[in-house]
Amino acid sequence: MAGGKGKSSGGKSSGGKTSGVDGTKKQQSHSARAGLQFPCGRVKRFLKQNTQNKMRVGAKAAVYVTAVLEYLTAEVLELAGNAAKDLKVKRITPRHLQLAIRGDEELDTLIRATIAFGGVLPHINRALLLKVEQKKKAKAIEA
């Protein structure tokens, strides 16, 4: 140990956290740090492009918006997957998305857009249903 205290580090400092083999930090994306699948960098770029007067966009704002988008997407896909499973189909179609969104009250109020090739929800008036049920009961009693 010539001329110093402790171990000689060969001119490199060992301060901070190291995760690589050679002691260097491994780069990690904002999405990986936040534990998200959606790209935080791309969302931040879109936020910067769509703000007026060249406003600044914080990194945490982009992460928050990305997390919200990921959550809503996961929620819709889960409901659409359930709708596809109920119909015994393995592929999610726009019809399944329509059934999922219109079936959930909160998503229905949030997403008021028209879904292409989504069709319409089946709706039968209650008055008509009651008459049909009464006829079935009458036939069952007669038989």
Swiss-Prot record:
Gene3D superfamilies: Histone, subunit A (1.10.20.10). The modification N6-acetyllysine is found at K5, K12. Its main location: nucleus. Residues 1-34 are annotated as: Disordered. SMART domains: H2A. SUPFAM superfamilies: Histone-fold. GO terms for cellular component: euchromatin; nucleosome; nucleus. GO terms for biological process: CENP-A eviction from euchromatin; nuclear-transcribed mRNA catabolic process, non-stop decay; regulation of transcription by RNA polymerase II; silent mating-type cassette heterochromatin formation; transcription elongation by RNA polymerase II. Keywords: Acetylation, Chromosome, DNA-binding, Nucleosome core, Nucleus. One of its GO terms (molecular function) is protein heterodimerization activity. Acetylated once deposited into chromatin. It is found in: Nucleus; Chromosome. Belongs to the histone H2A family. Variant histone H2A which can replace H2A in some nucleosomes. Nucleosomes wrap and compact DNA into chromatin, limiting DNA accessibility to the cellular machineries which require DNA as a template. Histones thereby play a central role in transcription regulation, DNA repair, DNA replication and chromosomal stability. DNA accessibility is regulated via a complex set of post-translational modifications of histones, also called histone code, and nucleosome remodeling. The nucleosome is a histone octamer containing two molecules each of H2A, H2B, H3 and H4 assembled in one H3-H4 heterotetramer and two H2A-H2B heterodimers. The octamer wraps approximately 147 bp of DNA. H2A or its variant H2A.Z forms a heterodimer with H2B. H2A.Z associates with the VPS72/SWC2 subunit of the SWR1 chromatin remodeling complex. Also interacts with RBP1/DNA-directed RNA polymerase II largest subunit. This is Histone H2A.Z. It comes from Chaetomium globosum (strain ATCC 6205 / CBS 148.51 / DSM 1962 / NBRC 6347 / NRRL 1970). The gene is HTZ1.
